[in-house]
Amino acid sequence: MDNMNHEELNDQLLVRREKLHNLREQGIDPFGKRFERTNATNELLSLYGEFSKEELEEKEISVSIAGRIMTKRGKGKAGFAHIQDLHGQVQIYVRKDAVGDEEYELFKTADLGDLVGIEGKVFKTNVGELSVKATGFTLLTKSLRPLPDKYHGLKDVEQRYRQRYLDLITSMESRETFVTRSKIIREMRRYLDDNGYLEVETPMMHAIAGGASARPFITHHNALDMELYMRIAIELHLKRLIVGGLEKVYEIGRVFRNEGVSTRHNPEFTMIELYEAYADYKDIMKLTENMVAHIAKQVLGTTTIQYGDYEINLEPEWTRLHMVDAIKEHSGADFWNPMSVEEARELAKEHNVEIKDTMEVGHIINEFFEQKVEDKLIQPTFIYGHPVEISPLAKKNDEDPRFTDRFELFIVAREHANAFTELNDPIDQKERFEAQLKEREQGNDEAHMMDDDYIEALEYGMPPTGGLGIGIDRLVMLLTNAPSIRDVLLFPAMRHKQD
């Protein structure tokens, strides 16, 4: 911002402070009291929008509304303004002879951004705009800072994220996104509750970071003098509840991963995890597609949505594709025949797939998938049959134990869900954890830690179980056509602001 803009802003701040002082001198509270509304702006339009000008004059409908002044015009003894609430805007018409000298003076000196209450009669202007003719004008909150230019809004994307309150004031689209987010979560809860799932709450601070391959945030508990990890997944506590006999459970909550920030990643994000006893990953596939389709229908009214340049069909049944078949289809590489790690490395070299020296065959298969397949999965696709090496908590496939009964859901080339038939063999689980410990020793700081308490829980017996995790932020991105995760988080993680 140049010096001129600084000076203009400072002048505006001074003028508004002076108005604040004058209000107090007159005995008017610039940060007022409770105001009772009869209607929101959208209710006025739905209730009275169809009436003619003459019908409204005859009915003399009295209303009480409140909101923020977004536009204002007029001279002399009358003026117009638009006030905005959560749901939209409505025009008000203020005449000196209708509200009195004192209240008209309040209207005249009001600034854009001030919050006001209006009592009045509903009418239509000569051009047919539904409006409220004020009989009372109340200042509810004096705004001491000018709003961004109404014609341009917040063009600085970073400012939109840092000052979300300004973004919400100036962008109806942004407000609608966050209202939709709330509806998505509400419908998700409703669907699961109606299908017999029990919502639970489990700790966010763990003695051992587990349930996912990710770097944790570490904190220190002073009273207990111990290090704790902010949870990287909800999984292991929910599976303990399955052991305890809570047969269908879910939790919607925050998860924390000490990793990079991008259009798809935020260090803290919201997940739903659910677990169902006596089910497997195929049951969870059906649950996933039916639940997402239900949410889209209830919130958006359709299962056909637009995301960027793509039209996405969320109507079940979705494509199911084994990871090895997907790799063969898109790269020609065939991993169905067992091979040594040397052969897998040679295959990676032939197909220009980047790998690390420490990778086993399963890791190389996964790299093939991520580098050759993932960005081609636009329509909803369940990729199943992940290698054991990258799935330490999933049950091995009975027919080919190199792979697991696990799936990931991809839509618009992004992972949206991860699920498996849960590993309930405590001996196998301990061996998997030990293999993960070796990976940690080789430098993989995302490998799983040993969790003896969880193994002990499994030793009491966990029934065959299907489990699912869905990143709610990415689902909201999909259903609101948002290009970045920051567009669906009210207050995303940001770097320190540079002076």
Curated annotation (Swiss-Prot):
Binding residue positions for Mg(2+) 1: E408, E415
Superkingdom classification of source: Bacteria
A GO molecular-function annotation: transferase activity
GO biological process, one term: lysyl-tRNA aminoacylation
Catalytic activity as recorded in UniProt: tRNA(Lys) + L-lysine + ATP = L-lysyl-tRNA(Lys) + AMP + diphosphate
Coiled coil: none
CDD domains, sorted: LysRS_core (cd00775), LysRS_N (cd04322)
Amino-acid biosynthesis recorded as keyword: no
Cofactor or coenzyme needed: Mg(2+)
Known partners and oligomeric status: Homodimer.
SUPFAM superfamilies in the record: Class II aaRS and biotin synthetases (SSF55681), Nucleic acid-binding proteins (SSF50249)
GO cellular component: cytosol
Organism of derivation: Bacillus cereus (strain AH187)
Pfam families assigned to the protein according to its UniProt record, in alphabetical order: tRNA-synt_2, tRNA_anti-codon
Name the UniProt record assigns to this protein: Lysine--tRNA ligase
InterPro entries on file: Aa-tRNA-synt_II, aa-tRNA-synth_II, aa-tRNA-synth_II/BPL/LPL, Lys-tRNA-ligase_II, Lys-tRNA-ligase_II_bac/euk, Lys-tRNA-ligase_II_N, Lys-tRNA-synth_II_C, NA-bd_OB-fold
Positions bound to Mg(2+) 2: E415
PROSITE patterns membership: AA_TRNA_LIGASE_II
HAMAP family: Lys_tRNA_synth_class2
E.C. designation(s): 6.1.1.6
Cofactor binding: number and manner: Binds 3 Mg(2+) ions per subunit.
UniProtKB keywords: Aminoacyl-tRNA synthetase, ATP-binding, Cytoplasm, Ligase, Magnesium, Metal-binding, Nucleotide-binding, Protein biosynthesis
Protein localization: Cytoplasm
Sequence similarity: Belongs to the class-II aminoacyl-tRNA synthetase family.
The keyword Protein biosynthesis appears for this protein: yes
